[in-house]
């Protein structure tokens, strides 16, 4: 029965395939364009301040900016702190 379904199934038209691909491309570009230009510098500044008090790897810091509505932006900051006291920076 599966073999019969395979031969009788309708193939997608090239127009539908192209439309789906364009929708994916547009969605990816929208997602990539929403990051403000200052976000990488903000991440570096936050990392610099945290490193004054605790020694962390730059990969342990995650900064994400979400746009909820036209007038609401949420800055999400995740920092994985070291477990041992020995890694703290004393000044």
Swiss-Prot record:
One of its GO terms (biological process) is regulation of division septum assembly. Prevents the cell division inhibition by proteins MinC and MinD at internal division sites while permitting inhibition at polar sites. This ensures cell division at the proper site by restricting the formation of a division septum at the midpoint of the long axis of the cell. It comes from the Bacteria. InterPro entries: MinE (IPR005527), MinE_sf (IPR036707). Belongs to the MinE family. Keywords: Cell cycle, Cell division. This is Cell division topological specificity factor. Pfam families: MinE.
